[in-house]
């Protein structure tokens, strides 16, 4: 009986010790809440077109932020200071970005400090050969369209391309138009853009990698 009590007491002691260790781990792992007025959460979305298509097609909207998706972004910005980059298709389904009107241009410009737009791909269907051959034309179409309906200040300085694909010719085009920052793959073992396996692994390990004047950042 006495031996049994000792075993139970030992087990309880071990459990208490494990709880204490776990509590200390949680305490040191979770960041201390900040009262700073300069807190920023940066969030980015790929494959964007439905919210922009809705703005184009729904005539009753008198503000960007009547559209449900943009309304949600505005609420997150107002409450948490979140800033957003939306990476858009040139075309998808019945959407063509060159058809977007400039109805909300001034409002986009007024909110461009926290809401940006950038190129993502020609369309959802991914074809490496087409994406490479048509890249400059498609990139400029999207860029000019964003300038038309959202203004220069709404252009995202950092891009994330479809499937993290960009060969050397596409990278050269990006540099031609002063784009020097790319968001890379966030999963281990995946190739990002024109980086080789070793370089992509370094990007994953270090969270950032500079190669040939391009600054690659882990998504």
Q: What are the functions of these language-model segments?
A:
Residues 27-108:
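Active-site beta->alpha N-cap acidic-glycine motif
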Residues 75-80, 145-149, 177:
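Structured segments of extracytoplasmic/periplasmic soluble domains
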Residues 83-167:
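Metal-dependent polysaccharide deacetylase catalytic core of the NodB/CE4 family, i.e.
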Residues 46-48, 89-91, 122, 161-164, ...:
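An acidic- and aromatic-residue-enriched active-site/binding cleft used to recognize and process polar
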Residues 1-17:
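N-terminal Sec-pathway targeting helices
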Residues 17-25:
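Hydrophobic alpha-helical membrane-insertion segments, chiefly the h-region
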Residues 67-72, 96-109, 144, 194-218:
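Alpha-helical scaffolding within the catalytic cores
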Residues 18-19, 31-32, 153-154, 163-219:
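Active-site-adjacent pocket scaffolds in enzyme catalytic domains
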């Amino acid at each position: 009986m006495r031996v049994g009590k000792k075993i139970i007491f030992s087990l309880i002691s071990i459990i208490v010790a494990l709880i204490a260790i776990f509590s200390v781990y949680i305490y040191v792992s979770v960041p201390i809440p900040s009262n700073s007025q300069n807190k920023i959460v940066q969030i980015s979305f790929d494959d964007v077109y439905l919210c922009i298509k809705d703005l184009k097609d729904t005539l009753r909207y008198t503000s960007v932020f009547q559209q449900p998706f943009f309304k949600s972004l505005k609420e997150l910005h107002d409450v948490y200071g979140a800033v957003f980059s939306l990476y858009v298709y040139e075309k998808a389904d019945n959407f063509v970005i060159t058809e977007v009107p400039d109805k909300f241009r001034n409002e986009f410009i007024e909110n461009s400090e926290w809401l940006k737009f950038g190129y993502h791909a020609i369309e959802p269907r991914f074809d490496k050969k087409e994406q490479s051959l048509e890249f400059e034309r498609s990139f400029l179409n999207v860029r000019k369209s964003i300038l038309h309906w959202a203004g220069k200040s709404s252009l995202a300085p950092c891009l994330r391309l479809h499937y993290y694909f960009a060969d050397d010719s596409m990278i050269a085009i990006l540099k031609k138009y002063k784009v020097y920052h790319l968001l890379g793959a966030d999963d281990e073992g995946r190739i990002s853009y024109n980086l080789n396996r070793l370089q992509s692994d370094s990007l994953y390990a270090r969270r950032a990698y500079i190669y040939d004047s391009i600054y690659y950042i882990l998504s």
